[in-house]
């Protein structure tokens, strides 16, 4: 328990979580984290006449759960399109956000490496009354991350993409939102009391951590974060930009018109994907 709670605090500090003790939820992977938000938050807040907004850069884990929920709840799904160089086309963002309750957004595409303007989109989403669910799987391992500066309401990422073990994911969420959400899974560990006529869920974050936790994986994630912090995330980012620039330049010189590189042309506008 002590090791897991130390890891929770460490993860929280790494991403700038205001209240790590209650806002960091451990899952088995980022896919489960995003499903948790879709089912627990979306299930309680979305219905006929509502809408959510996704982008055409999203990983399936930030698309399919919303499709599954849409089949049950009957809300609308809208899409932010792409420009020719695989950036988000925000031309019609005000119209797309009208009446939207949630925005699903990747911080960095897992296909093209495109970095998205998270803070800009989040500010517009909040002005429209929507919460923002961030897929940070590619972002957290490669850039210094501060969820407060990004302004998002939920962020999901996984251990195996940041030098940690498989089988461990993270969901960060604003305490007030997590507190209002029903449990995602039921069983041991997530209950405060069980009687013949019902149960009372545990407090945060245990409410969302049913069953035996991934203890070894959580400790491994802690060690991975310590290592990344030792390297320095700004140094990691500089090195990756240099490698990306070298790769793009060398491939273009050698292959010329035979090669098409999808995504932003400048290395600073993309991750090392």
Predicted regions, residues:
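Pyridoxal 5′-phosphate
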Residues: 1-273
């Amino acid at each position: 328990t002590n090791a897991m709670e130390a890891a929770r605090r460490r993860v929280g500090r790494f991403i700038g979580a205001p209240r790590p003790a209650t806002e960091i939820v451990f899952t088995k992977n980022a896919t489960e984290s995003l499903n948790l938000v879709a089912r627990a938050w979306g299930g309680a807040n979305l219905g006929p006449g509502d809408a959510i907004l996704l982008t055409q850069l999203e990983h399936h884990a930030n698309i399919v759960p919303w499709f599954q929920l849409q089949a049950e709840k009957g809300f609308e799904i809208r899409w932010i399109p792409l420009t020719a160089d695989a950036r988000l086309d925000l031309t019609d963002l005000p119209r797309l956000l009208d009446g939207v309750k949630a925005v699903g957004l990747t911080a960095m595409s897992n296909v093209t490496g495109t970095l998205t303007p998270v803070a800009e989109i989040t500010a517009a989403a909040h002005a429209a009354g929507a919460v923002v669910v961030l897929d940070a799987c590619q972002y957290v391992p490669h850039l210094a991350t501060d969820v407060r500066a990004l302004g998002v309401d939920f962020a999901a990422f996984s251990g195996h993409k940041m030098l940690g073990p498989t089988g461990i994911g993270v969901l960060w969420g604003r305490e007030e939102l997590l507190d209002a959400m029903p449990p995602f899974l039921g069983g041991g560990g997530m209950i405060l009391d069980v009687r013949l006529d019902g149960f009372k869920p545990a407090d945060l974050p245990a409410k969302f951590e049913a069953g035996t936790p991934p203890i070894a994986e959580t400790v491994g994630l802690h060690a991975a974060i310590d290592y990344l912090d030792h390297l320095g995330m700004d140094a990691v980012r500089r090195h990756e930009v240099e490698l990306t620039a070298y790769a793009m330049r060398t491939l273009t010189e050698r292959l010329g018109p035979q090669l098409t590189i999808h995504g932003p042309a400048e290395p600073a506008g993309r991750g090392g994907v």
